[in-house]
């Protein structure tokens, strides 16, 4: 075991997979000489050379399109988009081509590639460096979507994504890149895509989150415990496919659920989970599902931490559910 930040865990995952499998290549803006804008790919160019670690032009369309071509010819590319906000110029390649290759070829071709994206706010990045666009990806059939919150999960799930036969959008909470450290196995391991993590057991209320907001979710659960409320905490980790069984089992047990995300509220991913809970567990709910999200505005430069779900907002939502 070694104490790692998320950046270090991601770097270790890439290094190990490149050493293990010569088909794994990395491409993106500044991923080579610079080591990536957040230094996730630091040292890989020196170790594996420019044929496997490729600096690209500033063109998301070209990055995703090139990754698809590489995947179709037998490589396993890991493409980096510097910020999730910048993926939109690459949407034609990602949505129209990458996501649909297996389906439109009748399974003759697959697209085993990963598109890594630093996502979310809390770093005073403003409206072009703070968005959480996961709803676009989960709505696109053919993509798997991962959203990690810990170094342990980051390493295990990135390795699983690289080995997956289908395209994976890998969302990394930039706010947690260096603010969280934990012990991470130095040996090889993977985690299952599609499986949530039970972070805390409880019986009175379920709190569900992923990615950027998980520190606030866990802190809210700790505050509720001081007040005698036993909150169960689920970290989804994967948004497509999301862990239906874990969510339903937890909410059926507690009868109350608060869903937390830093994405805008309208048509958010947690809205889909809330709707599914309401449809399938209506007769077991003691209160309606409650969402705590970002706001339906562009992400602000000033006071960006007030845009994020706060512990106070989560506690207020929990109180509404408990008092219903």
Swiss-Prot record:
Native source organism of the sequence: Thermus thermophilus (strain ATCC BAA-163 / DSM 7039 / HB27)
Enzyme class, spelled out: oxidoreductase
Keywords: Oxidoreductase, Thiamine pyrophosphate
Residues binding substrate, per UniProt: 83-86, 129
Catalysed reactions listed for this entry: N(6)-[(R)-lipoyl]-L-lysyl-[protein] + 3-methyl-2-oxobutanoate + H(+) = N(6)-[(R)-S(8)-2-methylpropanoyldihydrolipoyl]-L-lysyl-[protein] + CO2
UniProt: thiamine diphosphate binding residues: 29, 58-60, 82, 86-89
Active-site residue list: 129
Cross-referenced Pfam families: Transket_pyr, Transketolase_C
Keyword Isomerase appears in the UniProt entry: no
GO molecular function, one term: 3-methyl-2-oxobutanoate dehydrogenase (2-methylpropanoyl-transferring) activity
Lineage, uppermost ranks: Bacteria, Thermotogati, Deinococcota, Deinococci, Thermales
Taxonomic superkingdom: Bacteria
Cofactor(s) in the UniProt record: thiamine diphosphate
Subunit structure: Heterotetramer of two alpha and two beta chains. Directly associated with ODBA in the E1 complex.
Function in brief: The branched-chain alpha-keto dehydrogenase complex catalyzes the overall conversion of alpha-keto acids to acyl-CoA and CO(2). It contains multiple copies of three enzymatic components: branched-chain alpha-keto acid decarboxylase (E1), lipoamide acyltransferase (E2) and lipoamide dehydrogenase (E3).
This enzyme's EC code(s): 1.2.4.4
Descriptive protein name: 2-oxoisovalerate dehydrogenase subunit beta
């Amino acid at each position: 075991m070694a104490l790692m930040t998320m950046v270090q865990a991601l770097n270790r995952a890439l290094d190990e997979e490149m050493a293990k499998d010569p088909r794994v290549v990395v491409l993106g803006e500044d991923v080579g000489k610079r080591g990536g804008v957040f230094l996730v790919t630091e040292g890989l160019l020196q170790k594996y050379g420019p044929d496997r670690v490729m600096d690209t032009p500033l063109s998301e369309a070209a990055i995703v399109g090139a990754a698809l071509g590489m995947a179709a010819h037998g490589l396993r590319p890991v493409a980096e988009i510097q910020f999730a906000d910048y993926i939109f110029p690459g949407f034609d390649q990602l949505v129209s081509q990458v996501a649909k290759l297996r389906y439109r070829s009748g399974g003759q071709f697959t697209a085993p590639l990963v598109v890594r994206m630093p996502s979310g706010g809390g770093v005073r990045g403003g409206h072009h460096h703070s968005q959480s666009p996961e709803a676009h990806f989960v709505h696109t059939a053919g993509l798997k979507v991962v959203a990690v919150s810990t170094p342990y999960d980051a390493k295990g799930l990135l390795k699983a994504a690289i080995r997956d036969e289908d395209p994976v959008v890998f969302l990394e909470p930039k706010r947690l890149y260096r603010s969280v450290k934990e012990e991470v196995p130095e040996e090889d391991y993977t985690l299952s895509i599609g499986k949530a993590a039970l972070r805390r057991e409880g019986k009175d209320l379920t709190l569900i989150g992923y990615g950027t907001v998980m520190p606030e979710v866990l802190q809210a659960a700790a505050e509720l415990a001081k007040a005698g409320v036993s909150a169960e905490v689920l970290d989804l980790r994967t948004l497509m496919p999301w862990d239906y069984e874990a969510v339903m089992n937890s909410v059926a047990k507690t009868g109350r659920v608060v869903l937390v995300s830093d994405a805008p509220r309208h048509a958010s991913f947690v809205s889909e989970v809330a709707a599914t809970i309401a449809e399938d567990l209506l007769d077991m709910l003691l209160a309606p599902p409650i969402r705590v999200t970002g706001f339906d505005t562009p992400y602000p430069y000033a006071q960006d931490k007030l845009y994020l779900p706060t512990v106070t907002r989560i506690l207020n939502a929990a109180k509404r559910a408990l008092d219903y």
